[in-house]
Amino acid sequence: MNICILDGYTTNPGDVSWAPLEALGNVTIYELTKPEDIAERAKDAEILITNKTVLSAETINALPKLQYIGTLSTGFNVIDCEAAKQRGIPVCNVPTYCTTAVAQFTFAMLFNITNKVELHNQSVHKGDWVNSRHF
């Protein structure tokens, strides 16, 4: 199985192992891919994985061996899903990516707004607390 990752650097700058994918077949990883380079880089791909690299209908139709498209994101906005559907190519995403981190960030922002965390942080850094006669 030939697996092509078009923009591996966007999700793995080197701190994650690609070994699970490599166990499935021949994996070729490109850090980033320009639109004009997709057809050449993915010409033998049966599995194509992207994150930010756009896969247009023209691109999808130019890859005769393509059997599967995966996006390393929650959204499908970079893939022409209709073109893939017409070719019978499944397209999958990572729907639970960052769910916990998004929830944590949401609560952090709520605390920042309700407790004025940033205002107090700036006050401490300006020396307001250490210079206050009450502390």
Protein language model annotation of sequence segments:
Residues 1-45:
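N-terminal glycine-/charge-rich "phosphate-binding" loop or analogous flexible N-terminal tail
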Residues 14-15, 32-39, 53-57, 78, ...:
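Structural motif corresponding to alpha-helix initiation and N-cap regions
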Residues 31, 72-73, 89-100:
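Short beta->alpha connector loops at strand-helix junctions that form conserved
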Residues 42-47, 64-67:
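Short acidic/histidine-rich motifs immediately flanking catalytic phosphotransfer sites
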Residues 54-66, 80-81:
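Rossmann-fold NAD(P) dinucleotide-binding segment
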Residues 77-89:
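Rossmann-fold NAD(P)-binding glycine/threonine-rich loop
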Residues 87, 95-135:
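Phosphate-binding beta-alpha-beta segment of Rossmann-like dinucleotide-binding domains, i.e.
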